[in-house]
Amino acid sequence: MALARDAKLESDTLQVLQDVANRLRIHSIRATCACSSGHPTSCCSVAEIMAVLFFHTMRYKQADPEHPDNDRFVLSKGHAAPILYAVWVEVGRICESDLLNLRKIHCDLEGHPTPRLSFVDVATGSLGQGLGAACGMAYTGKYFDKASYRVFCLMGDGESSEGSVWEALAFASHYNLDNLVAIFDVNRLGQSGTAPLEHCTAVYEKRCQAFGWNTYVVDGHDVEALCQAFWKAAQVKNKPTALIAKTFKGRGIPNVEDAENWHGKPMPKDRADGIVKLIENRIQTNRNLTPKPPIEDSPRISMSNTKMTSLPVYKLGDMIATREAYGLALAKLGQSNQRVIVLDGDTKNSTFSEVFKKEHPERFIECFIAEQNMVSVALGCATRGRTIAFVSTFAAFLTRAFDQIRMGAISQTNINFVGSHCGVSVGEDGPSQMALEDLAMFRSIPNCTVFYPSDAVSTEHAVYLAANTKGMCFIRTTRPKTAVIYTAEENFVIGQAKVIRQSAVDKVTVIGAGVTLHEALVAAEELSQQGIFIRVIDLFTIKPLDAVTIIQSAKATGGQIITVEDHYREGGIGEAVCAAISREPDIVVRQLAVTEVPRSGKPSELLDMFGISARHIIAAVKDTVMK
């Protein structure tokens, strides 16, 4: 494709871009030298790419990096963070002297970028995830904001071995994300040796083309070729573009360029000054280029009206699965705010997110069976507060995306996860479908609220609370139908449990959630007929846990607690309760949980086989009382 007249570049512009690239190299070398760690060679391979992107191609407001109309940039190869910080020194947002505090505890210029910095949308550094997040940003720009901003993602060639990269490539082409450009920094070298394809740019190109992408192979150190390729990419419709840049690690550094064993090593201090002087001698001007301003056409949005529009419609005793109640609540939530979106991994007819899709099809994203990418896409969609994202699949399959979820926490995201088909109550499908580790996983995530509703009414409240809660949330839903135990007027608060059965003569406090709460209620009724009374607590949120209610109830019942959960013992409800009462010497906790890998069977059979049915609760209560 020939360049249009306005895309032609003057020689002085090209020289300024090359000079900027070399200044970026110098900043990266000095910063990593100052902290005696970091990745200057990985920075040097992308210096021209970064110079062209930020000072020629991208449109953004220098003084407002978070502006909704700015082009987006994701540094998927997060170890090259120093050169990103160097860019913002050249832009004027960071003092050059601050670079010398790179990686120091009092400085936000960390070893890998995080959103502590206003110009970073998502944390990176765990490789292979940046493109998925960029897909979410691009999808939001094209389909929700319907805006002009574009998204650029810079990746390393080593990380292209990650399967999540190819999940993202498939997603982007399926949804025709022509506002997305992925840049492969093909510098040949990985951390401990060569990358698998080394400099075979033709293979990268064929693979990207096979995934439905428009492609350009360029010399990644030729600023004019880069400018032309980015301009061409902007003209392409209905396809994302992959720019495959042949580069050299450590470019511009004598005896280091394209040499192995320099990954993650700063330049020796006795050589650094000489290297910097050499690069400075290549710089012909101190001029800079002013980025083009963005096209301001993103809609102005508000999240303040994300409220429960009406009370739940369920009646006491109605039988409905919490997974179905989730779908119905989500559809209702979607009516209150047009920025509520839902992502699912080809399980919408099981998680019941299909109810939302039927009412709001334009806000439903089918991510197919690619859970890692689904989480990254949601992360991208939620950046800059553009959407309220719910992500649903079987809870067992969310474990596959634990690293993406972990990085979401580092990114300070507000994604809401919903995992269905939890525990042995899944039944005949067997252990591969049963989430028995999910509570442990989400409890370990910083600032993550963990909901475990026990009926349809509490599920609806959990959905609305999650939508309005800062940080990540996880809602655990179950497959079998359970009875509605709360009236429509019942109020729910994060961190407050419900004492749903009590008397003045209770002997034991039994704590459950989900299906085991209903087993506890059955046990309580049968025990009462035998003259034994127990207190039953519905936790509602596992994190934060209502320690006050638990301790008060335990002290009122002789210091005796029994926890019962459809989850492995490790990391579940029992351990959470034990932690909550750890400073109470007179309280004893007995845990009923799944203790081995289960098998197929009817839900009731499995609850009984693995010791968490009403029968086992009754036996545990009697044993406790007898002691």
Curated annotation (Swiss-Prot):
The record marks H39, H263 as: Important for catalytic activity. The keyword Calcium applies. One of its GO terms (molecular function) is transketolase activity. Its EC number is 2.2.1.1. It catalyses: D-sedoheptulose 7-phosphate + D-glyceraldehyde 3-phosphate = aldehydo-D-ribose 5-phosphate + D-xylulose 5-phosphate. The active site is at E371. Mg(2+) binds at D157, N187, L189. Its cofactor is Mg(2+); Ca(2+); Mn(2+); Co(2+). Pfam families: Transket_pyr (PF02779), Transketolase_C (PF02780), Transketolase_N (PF00456). It comes from the Eukaryota. One of its GO terms (cellular component) is cytoplasm. Homodimer. This is Transketolase-like protein 2. Thiamine diphosphate binds at S42, H79, G125, S126, L127, G158, N187, K249, H263, E371, F397, Q433. Plays an essential role in total transketolase activity and cell proliferation in cancer cells; after transfection with anti-TKTL1 siRNA, total transketolase activity dramatically decreases and proliferation was significantly inhibited in cancer cells. Plays a pivotal role in carcinogenesis. Keywords: Calcium, Magnesium, Metal-binding, Thiamine pyrophosphate, Transferase. Substrate binds at H39, H263, R323, S350, H421, D429, R479. Binds 1 Mg(2+) ion per subunit. Can also utilize other divalent metal cations, such as Ca(2+), Mn(2+) and Co(2+). Binds 1 thiamine pyrophosphate per subunit. NCBIfam families: PRK05899.2-5. It comes from Mus musculus. Belongs to the transketolase family.
